[in-house]
Structures are given as C-alpha cells and as structure tokens.
UniProtKB/Swiss-Prot annotation:
Uppermost EC category: lyase
Residues that coordinate or bind Fe cation: H54, H58, C128
Subunit (UniProt): Homodimer.
Name the record gives this protein: S-ribosylhomocysteine lyase
Cystine residue pairs: none
EC number: 4.4.1.21
Gene name as annotated: luxS
Amino acid sequence: MPLLDSFTVDHTRMAAPAVRVAKTMKTPHGDNITVFDLRFCRPNIEVMPERGIHTLEHLFAGFMRDHLNGDGVEIIDISPMGCRTGFYMSLIGTPDEQRVAESWKAAMSDVLKVTDQRKIPELNEYQCGTYDMHSLKEAQEIAQHIVDHDIGINQNDDLALPKDKLAELHI
C-alpha cells in the first residue's frame, strides 16, 4: 500500500490551530489544486467531540466559501479528518496560508453567530447521514477556541519524518 502524504509528517510536532499545505497538484488542464490541513487540535493530545465536529462540518463548508472563494480560489470540499483533530480543505487555486488562516478565523466567527440549531444547513434525515448527531454548543466551543488563538502555519519541511524513521515505522 502506498504511503499517503499525510503520514509523512511528524504529528508529535504539529502546532494547532495551524494551517499546512498538505499537497499541491495540477490537473491535466493546468488548474492548480491545493489541499490544506486545517489543524484544530494537537494530534494525540486533543480531539474534537463527534457531535461538535459534525455540526461544524455542516456550517464550516458554507462559511469558509463566503470568506475564501474568489480572486482565483474556489473551494472544492472541506471534510473532517477521521482522527477528529482537523479538516482537509481541497480547492482550486493557490492562496497563501495567511489568507486561509484569516478566512478560517472569519468562518469561525460566523459559527458563533448561529443562534439556533434549526439554522444548521442540511440538518434533516434526507440530506444528512446522521442527522440526530449534532451539537451547536460543541461546534461553537470549537469555533471559540479558534477565535481565541492565533492560527499558526505548519511547514512540511519542519514536520517531515526522516527517511530512516519512515522505514522503521513502515509495516
């Protein structure tokens, strides 16, 4: 099985909250695709609660588009990580990490303005696979944590696992 990009960085040294360019690629037509690691929590130390991250997934996707789309950028998808320490965001374009961080913080401020769980988009059995697993309160606690802290930048070169360590860890 090939080693995925996300497993070549040392999770014990990741800062959070922080933005990291996880991957860049070009489509056959020449479009730039960038995948960002939006790390909300320090891996293996903190974790977002499942109801909160699920609600945040519903809110974050729209709010982030409001703040980041335009000027050569269009978000394709924002999805939570299985480890519940962050989200991956795939987009067309190459915005710098600071622009992403500012948009992320603005999106979290928008989450804090939602006043009623019934205002969560697609919160129904037809559009959500687990529509009763939500918590606006938990989502807002996560958002408040981001608003209250500076968003750093994680650099791949600083986090790269050495080749000998990768060989040692490879099964």
